[in-house]
């Protein structure tokens, strides 16, 4: 199965705000494809939306290491990490990750 198919499925769960399904499906996919950063991203996004910030932190911090030459995905990881640390009450790390995301967005323009 091409990886675009499950990524589109995860995007549709996100758009429909089905975050419980999103996080479970993404977690299942990343166990089968452990080097695919998109699955970590979507799992983290789902966990953030469900306010499961510790799970989001773990999956996002692992997944960011698999992002290679994809500044958009990297910026999205940093945004989700910022949301995670905001939820965990760590404002210094929240600001750090939002700043990194902002820097990547500026470089892309």
Where on the chain are the PLM-derived regions?
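Start-of-helix register in tetratricopeptide repeats
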Residues: 4, 37-38, 72, 76
């Amino acid at each position: 199965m091409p990886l675009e198919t499950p990524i589109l499925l995860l995007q549709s769960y996100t758009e429909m705000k089905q975050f419980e399904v999103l996080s479970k499906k993404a977690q299942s996919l990343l166990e089968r494809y452990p080097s695919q950063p998109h699955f970590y991203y979507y799992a983290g996004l789902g966990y953030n939306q469900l306010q499961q910030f510790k799970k989001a932190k773990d999956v996002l911090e692992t997944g960011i290491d698999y992002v290679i030459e994809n500044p958009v995905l990297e910026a999205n990881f940093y945004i989700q990490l910022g949301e995670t640390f905001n939820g965990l009450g760590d404002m210094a790390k929240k600001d750090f990750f939002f700043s990194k995301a902002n820097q990547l967005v500026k470089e892309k323009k």
